[in-house]
Amino acid sequence: MSGKGKVHGGKGKSSETAKSTTSHSARAGLQFPVGRIKRYLKRTAQNKIRVGSKSAIYLTAVLEYLTAEVLELAGNAAKDLKVKRITPRHLQLAIRGDEELDNLIKATIAFGGVLPHINKALLLKVEKKKQK
């Protein structure tokens, strides 16, 4: 032994045969980070509860789906108003326009404004005046 370290060409993996690492998100076919969601779950779990990898993948998929749903509805609202940028107002219109999302998201959206609403009793009086 000359003491010059390991001899190359032995049983070690070469760069050609080494597998490239794939993220949990790529394996699950998701865009949101599964590893980060798992870390957040571990951090917020009480009494050092173990968190399974499938639970993190499932939660990530749910979050990604809800985000895509809200963005699709907000994009439609922006397209209806003939603008190319989604603003908080478009998010507000999208969320409050969908009954299920409205029940799910009870938060106030900053700079979202209010939904236009006219009481039906007021509309009836206006229509009666037009008929006369």
Swiss-Prot record:
Q: Which GO terms describe its cellular component?
A: euchromatin; nucleosome; nucleus
The primary site where this protein sits is: nucleus
Q: Where is this region: Disordered?
A: 1-27
Q: Give GO terms for biological process.
A: CENP-A eviction from euchromatin; nuclear-transcribed mRNA catabolic process, non-stop decay; regulation of transcription by RNA polymerase II; silent mating-type cassette heterochromatin formation; transcription elongation by RNA polymerase II
Arranged from A to Z, the UniProt key words for this protein are:
Acetylation, Activator, Chromatin regulator, Chromosome, DNA-binding, Nucleosome core, Nucleus, Transcription, Transcription regulation
> PTM N6-acetyllysine: at which residues?
4, 11, 13
How is the polypeptide modified once translated?
A: Acetylated once deposited into chromatin.
Bias (Basic residues) ranges: 1-11
Q: N-acetylserine: which positions carry it?
A: 2
Q: Where in the cell is it found?
A: Nucleus; Chromosome
Q: Which GO terms describe its molecular function?
A: chromatin DNA binding; identical protein binding; protein heterodimerization activity; RNA polymerase II cis-regulatory region sequence-specific DNA binding; structural constituent of chromatin
Self-association and partners: The nucleosome is a histone octamer containing two molecules each of H2A, H2B, H3 and H4 assembled in one H3-H4 heterotetramer and two H2A-H2B heterodimers. The octamer wraps approximately 147 bp of DNA. H2A or its variant H2A.Z forms a heterodimer with H2B. H2A.Z associates with the VPS72/SWC2 subunit of the SWR1 chromatin remodeling complex. Also interacts with RBP1/DNA-directed RNA polymerase II largest subunit.
The function of this protein is: Variant histone H2A which can replace H2A in some nucleosomes. Nucleosomes wrap and compact DNA into chromatin, limiting DNA accessibility to the cellular machineries which require DNA as a template. Histones thereby play a central role in transcription regulation, DNA repair, DNA replication and chromosomal stability. DNA accessibility is regulated via a complex set of post-translational modifications of histones, also called histone code, and nucleosome remodeling.
Give the protein family: Belongs to the histone H2A family.
Per its record, how is this protein called by name?
A: Histone H2A.Z
